Amino acid sequence: MIGKPRGRRGVNLQILPSAMTVLSICAGLTAIKFALEHQPKAAMALIAAAAILDGLDGRVARILDAQSRMGAEIDSLADAVNFGVTPALVLYVSMLSKWPVGWVVVLLYAVCVVLRLARYNALQDDGTQPAYAHEFFVGMPAPAGAVSMIGLLALKMQFGEGWWTSVWFLSFWVTGTSILLVSGIPMKKMHAVSVPPNYAAALLAVLAICAAAAVLAPYLLIWVIIIAYMCHIPFAVRSQRWLAQHPEVWDDKPKQRRAVRRASRRAHPYRPSMARLGLRKPGRRL
């Protein structure tokens, strides 16, 4: 008896997230090739492509229910390549190869990225973390570090040579970025950022402006992103400290948390720092 021919097996979509991760590694390594060929624009574009793929692969894995231990390990290795090794080598080849200290600072950056990723993986398996910990990074995330590094190249592309291309400024900036990567400073995760409904229209307008700037002034946009990210750090620290002091709101939604904070401010209108400094409300008698 002749059996029925087997149908062609469909493509297993569960490999798609890992395929995207591998593509991001290819983009990151190809960026180094273009940097060696003195094509910094192409190198920066490929690093951006690697970052986009890195941001999408995890979401695709969750949508397809294709999360696995192997996928997580590949993703971590991809981050080390794309946001550690690649930005370090691109910046070294493009701007720092003339000075011996250049190799030292980019090596420091790459090592700090690896250490930061190792700590992140360890914290993921730590069951003792408080409930709010998943809303914050510990230290600067690796993609933000890569943007900080590429920002130096963006300054040169936009304005040419200047004090911003001096070895002292470059070394200071790269070292500072490396310290932020391995620091314990809390920084907000994007998925944990909530926007009140009355600010939604303004946010859409800002996104439209950023989309236009990405075409008209991409190098300046990189620095707008860097400055905005640096400015958010004090607010992230304040938010993390407030959450640590209010465990009763750990499971609340952002809207409920904002209501609790407003009520707390109304109940305690004077900040502790004002009391320590002996400050008083204008018009109030001593």
UniProtKB/Swiss-Prot annotation:
Gene Ontology biological-process annotations: phospholipid biosynthetic process
Keywords attached to this entry: Cell membrane, Lipid biosynthesis, Lipid metabolism, Membrane, Phospholipid biosynthesis, Phospholipid metabolism, Transferase, Transmembrane, Transmembrane helix
Membrane topology: Multi-pass membrane protein
Entries under Pfam families matching the protein: CDP-OH_P_transf (PF01066)
Family to which this protein belongs: Belongs to the CDP-alcohol phosphatidyltransferase class-I family.
PANTHER family given in the database record: CDP-DIACYLGLYCEROL--GLYCEROL-3-PHOSPHATE 3-PHOSPHATIDYLTRANSFERASE-RELATED, CDP-DIACYLGLYCEROL--SERINE O-PHOSPHATIDYLTRANSFERASE
Name by which UniProt lists this protein: CDP-diacylglycerol--serine O-phosphatidyltransferase
Gene name per UniProt: pssA
